[in-house]
C-alpha cells in the first residue's frame, strides 16, 4: 500500500503529526522502533514545563501559543487533563539574558507576566532562597504538561482514526525515487508521497549528516512536603544559577518534587550508552548545589530517570525539508525544550504532507543556517 504520509518516530511530535494528518483525511503510516509511550526517548518522566514568554527567544512564541491552543483543544476533545496551569516562575540574576528574553517575549506578544525583585520573591514564595540581585518573571497562565499521558492520548486518537501503526519496528533506510519515497524497515518496505522524520535522539542513524548530537540527561524526584505543592501555590520553575547553568522543576506531587539540570550531560553515540539513572556518579549529586542555595528545604533523592536530548549546534530547532529531497521533512534538534511544541510541530508536519505552508513563520529553524 502507498501512503500519503509516513511518520518515522511516533513519540511526541510524531504522534501529533500522525494525528493531525489523519484528521485531514490523509492515509498515514506511523512507525516507531519501540512502543510509544515508552522510556527510550524524550517524552517519559511524567511532566514537561509549558512556558509562553520564552527565554530562548521571541521567535518561539507564536509556535508555543499555537501549541497551547492545540493541547487545550486535544484535552477538550478527549476528556484528558493534559495541561495544568500552575504558573511558572523564571528566576535569575537581574542581568540575565534568558530573563531579558522572557520579558521581551511577553512585551512583544502582550503576555501576562509579573516581575518581582528578591524581596518580593521571598514574600510570595518563602521556600525559595535567592540572592539580593535576583529577579523573577512569573507567568501565571503557564504550567506543565502531562507528557506520557499526552503521547498515550495522541496514540489512542490516531489508532481510533484508522491510522496505520507499525511499532517495535526499526527503520533502516529512507530511499527516494521518482515515484515517491520508500521507508525500509525490518518488517518490509513501505512507500509514501511524503515522509516526516521525527526520530528524536537517534535521527542520525537515518540522516547521518544532520547537525544533531545526542546527549544523555537525567532528572530526579526529591522528598518535599506540602509547602512545595500546587495546593500551596508553588509553581513550576526555571532557575538560572550565577554561573548561567539552568535548572528546572515542578510542584511536588505525593511529597516528591521533580527537578533537573538543563545544561551538561554526557555525549553518547548509541542507545546502549544511555545508561540508567545512577550509573554516573554525578547523577545523584548534580542538583545538590542548586538545592542547597535555592531550595534548602527539599530533601533526599527518592528516584531518578535518564533521558536524552537531540542537540543542535545552536540549541534551536531544526524544521525543514532535506536539501536532497523536498518530499522528506525532518523535525529534530529540539535540544531539551521541544515537548511543549509537539502539537504545533505535528500540525506543521501534517500541513507539509498536504502541500500547505505553515501559518507560523518557521524560517528561523531551517537547515540553511548551518551551511
UniProtKB/Swiss-Prot annotation:
GO terms for molecular function: flavin adenine dinucleotide binding; N-methyl-L-amino-acid oxidase activity; sarcosine oxidase activity. Its EC number is 1.5.3.-. It catalyses: N(alpha)-methyl-L-tryptophan + O2 + H2O = L-tryptophan + formaldehyde + H2O2. It is an enzyme of class 1 (oxidoreductase). Its cofactor is FAD. SUPFAM superfamilies: FAD-linked reductases, C-terminal domain (SSF54373), FAD/NAD(P)-binding domain (SSF51905). Keywords: FAD, Flavoprotein, Oxidoreductase. One of its GO terms (cellular component) is cytosol. The modification S-8alpha-FAD cysteine is found at residue 307. It comes from the Bacteria. Binds 1 FAD per subunit. The keyword Flavoprotein applies. Monomer. This is N-methyl-L-tryptophan oxidase. It comes from Yersinia pestis. The gene is solA.
Amino acid at each position: 500500500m502507498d501512503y500519503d504520509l509516513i511518520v518515522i518516530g511516533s513519540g511526541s511530535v510524531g504522534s501529533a503529526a500522525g494525528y493531525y494528518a489523519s484528521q485531514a483525511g490523509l492515509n498515514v503510516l506511523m512507525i516507531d522502533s519501540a512502543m510509544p509511550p515508552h522510556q527510550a526517548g524524550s517524552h517519559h518522566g511524567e511532566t514537561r514545563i509549558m512556558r509562553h514568554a520564552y527565554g530562548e527567544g521571541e521567535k518561539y512564541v507564536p509556535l508555543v501559543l499555537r501549541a497551547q491552543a492545540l493541547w487545550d483543544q486535544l484535552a477538550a476533545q478527549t476528556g484528558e487533563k493534559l495541561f495544568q496551569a500552575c504558573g511558572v516562575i523564571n528566576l535569575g540574576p537581574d542581568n540575565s539574558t534568558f530573563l531579558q528574553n522572557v520579558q521581551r517575549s511577553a512585551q512583544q506578544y502582550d503576555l501576562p507576566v509579573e516581575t518581582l525583585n528578591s524581596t518580593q520573591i521571598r514574600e510570595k514564595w518563602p521556600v525559595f532562597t535567592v540572592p539580593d540581585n535576583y529577579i523573577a518573571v512569573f507567568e501565571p497562565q503557564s504550567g506543565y504538561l502531562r507528557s506520557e499521558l499526552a503521547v498515550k492520548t495522541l496514540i489512542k486518537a490516531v489508532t481510533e482514526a484508522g491510522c496505520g501503526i507499525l511499532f517495535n519496528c526499526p527503520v533502516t533506510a529512507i530511499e527516494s525515487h521518482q515515484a515517491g519515497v520508500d521507508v525500509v524497515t525490518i518488517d518490509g518496505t513501505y512507500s509514501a508521497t511524503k515522509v516526516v522524520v521525527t526520530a528524536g535522539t537517534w535521527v542520525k542513524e537515518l540522516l547521518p549528516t544532520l547537525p544533531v548530537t545526542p546527549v544523555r540527561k537525567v532528572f530526579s524526584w526529591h522528598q518535599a512536603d506540602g509547602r512545595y505543592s500546587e495546593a500551596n501555590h508553588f509553581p513550576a520553575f526555571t532557575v538560572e544559577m550565577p554561573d548561567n547553568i539552568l535548572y528546572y522543576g515542578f510542584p511536588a506531587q505525593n511529597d516528591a518534587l521533580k527537578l533537573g539540570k538543563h545544561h551538561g550531560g554526557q555525549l553518547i553515540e548509541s542507545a546502549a550508552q544511555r545508561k540508567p539513572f545512577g550509573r554516573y556518579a554525578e547523577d545523584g549529586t548534580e542538583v545538590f548545589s542548586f538545592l542547597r542555595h535555592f531550595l534548602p528545604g527539599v530533601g533526599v533523592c527518592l528516584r531518578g530517570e535518564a533521558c536524552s536530548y537531540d542537540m543542535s549546534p545552536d540549541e534551536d530547532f531544526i524544521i525543514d525539508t532535506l536539501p536532497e529531497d523536498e518530499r522528506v521533512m525532518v523535525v529534530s534538534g529540539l535540544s531539551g525544550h521541544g515537548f511543549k511544541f509537539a502539537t504545533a510541530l505535528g500540525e506543521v508536519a501534517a500541513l507539509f504532507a498536504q502541500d500547505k505552508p505553515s501559518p507560523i513563520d518557521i524560517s528561523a529553524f531551517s537547515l540553511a543556517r548551518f551551511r
